Amino acid sequence: ISYIGSYEGMEKGMIMETKTPYYGIATGKLRRYFDLKNFTDPFRIIKGYFEARSRLKKIHPDVVFSKGGFVAVPVVRAAHALKIPVIIHESDMTPGLANKLCIPVASKVCCNFPETLKYLPSDKAVLSGSPIRSQLFEGDRSRGLHFCGLTSDKPVILIMGGSLGAVAVNEAVRAVLPELLKDFQVIHLCGKGKTDKSLNNVTGYVQYEFIKEELRDLLAAADLIISRAGANAICEILALRKPNILIPLPAAASRGDQILNAESFQKQGFSYLLPEEEITNEKFLDTIHQVYSDRENYQKQMASSQQNQAIPIIADLIDQLASV
């Protein structure tokens, strides 16, 4: 395996830690709005295309796999020009601009959601779900409880507001916390700078800005998850078969993709969708108790999903195209 990315992308250090060969190329962002860089970035993209051709000739891969993003466009286009098969993975419900530019030259296009299939050429589309890092399946419940100082006497709710936290979700949790702690324990990932010091010593409640290494253990400890509805996060929840309540970013604060993601998961019986603007103390508590009571049905639906098999599906596609 070799990896092509931007010269100084945040992924560079992570990839190099795995001893995977990393090749940088020039990149330019694809914007839908006015920016002075719109005048210079096309030249960077063209430069990136020729650098990608050079890197691919050196690597000589059997297949190129792309997760999208502006870095991928010159690489995918260069691979097509060199007659190297390309597999694309689209994480969101609707293809982003970069993938829209890559789909015409791709051999196969994998996706997370059944609703995405209508946007893709039928002879290329594959419903795979999202590849999930294997470390997430190595979590240990008892280790997670010990890390948080919790017990096994009450079920555990894990609340995740995304990497930056979610003010509305944090406020909703704190407003009902005394009632919530009568029946549950709570692990609250609040986001950077968003913890509440007045709650530091509340029994049965722990809060962190974010968690990295121990997250797999916290996920294993959770009986119910409350989360935003980013594609990667909810696919991890699905893979772990955790009953969940999704509170997507409102349309006013996003392009609406999280709402579509949550609607799809609710339609398939994987999740309960709770719009942020509909949250009241009473509804929040009722929803938590309802989903927890119905947890076995949610787990049953998630267990039957074909979106849980992304890694073997994608590996099989790579094998097929590599042998062509």
Segments the model singles out, each with a brief description of its role:
Residues 1-44, 49, 53, 128, ...:
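Conserved nucleotide-sugar phosphate-binding/catalytic loop shared by glycosyltransferases and other
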Residues 10, 21, 80-142:
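Active-site-proximal region of nucleotide-activated glycan assembly enzymes
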Residues 14, 18, 141-143, 150-225, ...:
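Donor-nucleotide binding loops and adjacent catalytic segments primarily
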Residues 20, 84-85, 223-224, 241-249, ...:
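Structural loop-to-beta junction motif characteristic of Rossmann-like glycosyltransferase folds
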Residues 51-64, 71-87, 100-105:
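Glycosyltransferases and closely related glycan-assembly transferases
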Residues 296-308:
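A short, well-ordered alpha-helix in the C-terminal region of glycosyltransferases
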Residues 307-324:
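C-terminal alpha-helical cap of glycosyltransferases
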